[in-house]
């Protein structure tokens, strides 16, 4: 199925690894031009070697001023994927100020800032656009030691709805994808303990974790005109976890 992404220009944050990297590769394969944002230069260099033509931008999205400078002249963007995130896991009684600041700065504040930059450009050009925020099932279910992470993703879901409300009149659609555990290299490492994995898998009706392509396919669908009447949604990619 042709998603009609050829010739469009996309920006993907957290593009160096995992879901972000795979999203960049899928967008390029679909004929889109892609700006890849990561804080890790080595990851960007490796991505460009694998996929020539990707436009790399190296910046720490937790730094508001640096992000403003790095993206102020990024050029026209039609599609945005806010994927960058951190997960700093601590028991509630041990949550630190540093974990709060870092998590909210990257997982929420940076989404606001990058989306403002991109949406203002869309509005100035008078063109429609699509934004996808990568959220999590943790936005809607409490998970042990995920106090700050769950809170940032819950806020991201509401931000998605607010953006959809206020950007809709400008023909900009905004949606979120909410995956379960995803089998990125980090996901495989973090959930390699069979006892830990079983506790989560027992809550997933399909009995398995998500593969990266499950999430990427959903992102591309939400970016495409095939989802032209969909905005303000938080779409689970969770094997039924949120249905239980």
Curated annotation (Swiss-Prot):
Membrane topology field: Peripheral membrane protein
Any single GO molecular-function term of the entry would be:
L-xylulose reductase (NADPH) activity
* Active site residues according to the UniProt entry: 149 (proton acceptor), 153
Q: Which family does it belong to?
A: Belongs to the short-chain dehydrogenases/reductases (SDR) family.
Q: Does the keyword Chaperone apply?
A: no
Q: Protein name, please?
A: L-xylulose reductase
Which residues are recorded as modified (Omega-N-methylarginine)?
21
Tissue expression: Highly expressed in kidney, liver and epididymis. Expressed at intermediate level in lung. Weakly or not expressed in brain, heart, spleen and testis.
Name the GO cellular-component terms: apical plasma membrane; brush border; cytoplasmic microtubule; cytosol; microvillus
Q: Which Gene3D superfamilies match?
A: NAD(P)-binding Rossmann-like Domain (3.40.50.720)
Identify the CDD domains for this entry. XR_like_SDR_c
Chief location category:
membrane
Q: Which residues bind NADP(+)?
A: 11-39
- Biological process, per Gene Ontology: D-glucuronate catabolic process to D-xylulose 5-phosphate; D-xylose metabolic process; glucose metabolic process; NADP metabolic process; positive regulation of reactive oxygen species metabolic process; xylulose metabolic process
Q: Which keywords annotate this record?
A: Acetylation, Carbohydrate metabolism, Cell membrane, Glucose metabolism, Membrane, Methylation, NADP, Oxidoreductase, Xylose metabolism
């Amino acid at each position: 199925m042709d998603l009609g992404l050829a010739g469009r220009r996309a920006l993907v944050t957290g593009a160096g690894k995992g879901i972000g990297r795979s999203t960049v590769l899928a967008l390029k394969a679909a004929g889109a031009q892609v700006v890849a944002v990561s804080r890790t230069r080595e990851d960007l260099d490796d991505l460009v070697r694998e996929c020539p033509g990707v436009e790399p931008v190296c910046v720490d999205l937790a730094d508001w001023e640096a992000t403003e400078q790095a993206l102020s002249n990024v050029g026209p963007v039609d599609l945005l994927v806010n994927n960058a995130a951190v997960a700093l896991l601590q028991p509630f009684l041990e949550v630190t100020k540093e974990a709060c600041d870092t998590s909210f700065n990257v997982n929420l504040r940076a989404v606001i800032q990058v989306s403002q930059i991109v949406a203002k450009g869309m509005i100035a050009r008078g063109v429609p656009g699509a934004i996808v925020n990568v959220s999590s099932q943790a936005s809607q279910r409490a998970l042990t030691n995920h106090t700050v992470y769950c809170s940032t993703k819950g806020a991201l879901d509401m931000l998605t709805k607010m953006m959809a409300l206020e950007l809709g009149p400008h023909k900009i659609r905004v949606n979120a994808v909410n995956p379960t555990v995803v089998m990125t290299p980090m996901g495989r490492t973090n959930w390699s303990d069979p006892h830990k994995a079983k506790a989560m898998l027992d809550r997933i009706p399909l009995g398995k974790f998500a593969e990266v392509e499950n999430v990427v396919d959903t992102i591309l669908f939400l970016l495409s005109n095939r989802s032209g009447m969909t905005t303000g949604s938080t779409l689970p990619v969770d094997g039924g976890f949120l249905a239980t």
